[in-house]
From Swiss-Prot:
The active site is at residues 159, 197. PANTHER family: LEXA REPRESSOR, LEXA REPRESSOR-RELATED. Its EC number is 3.4.21.88. The record marks 124-125 as: Cleavage. The keyword Nuclease does not apply. Belongs to the peptidase S24 family. It comes from Rhizobium radiobacter. The lineage of its organism: Bacteria, Pseudomonadati, Pseudomonadota, Alphaproteobacteria, Hyphomicrobiales. The keyword Transcription regulation applies. This is LexA repressor.
Amino acid sequence: MLTRKQQELLLFIHGTNEGNPGVPPSFDEMKDALDLASKSGIHRLITALEERGFIRRLPNRARALEVIKLPEAYAGASQVRRGFSPTVIEGSLGKLASPPPAPKPAPPAEAASVAVPVMGRIAAGVPISAIQNNMHDISVPVEMIGSGEHYALEIKGDSMIEAGILDGDTVIIRNGSTASPGDIVVALIDDEEATLKRFRRKGASIALEAANPAYETRIFGPDRVKIQGRLVGLIRRYH
């Protein structure tokens, strides 16, 4: 499973080559297409795509990449229409142009993991300003997340301790705008503050319920709260 940015870059490279065979996108074009601030982000995405087997560096051809496969959702349709063959992209890749390393054996299925972007910190306490920048990626077991788009957030605060969520934990969130009563959700309040709380309904209003008796349940009108996803997993590091 690819992150959204990895998938966007892979499809952009493949689409550019199809539309202009032999004319690769430059790093500036890739950076602008993905709305990234610097080229270093493109380097990291290309490396991640290579590690996941979607592209490879070509030996004996300076500054060349080969698109080996597309994500299943795109590859199937592509093969039906015209048959998919690897796409070769040549360009100025700097250090990325070195010959590819020897293939590594695939890990056993139970050890498979995916990269999930850590988007910032979220309050399990008093709401803090929402952070929407990709800080880094975290490796998450495939069986933890299942289908859908996911992101991760680092917990700040102790309002969810009775739900087993502690300060410093990393929570895995399935992106979505709906929730069922009892779900633990990322709630955006007044488009300004984000908090992790249990979702409840109180008549026509929305209640954000803590899992710590030191914190009061907060009630909002439905137009003030937007659901940004629901909790599906948690990662804790012991120091």
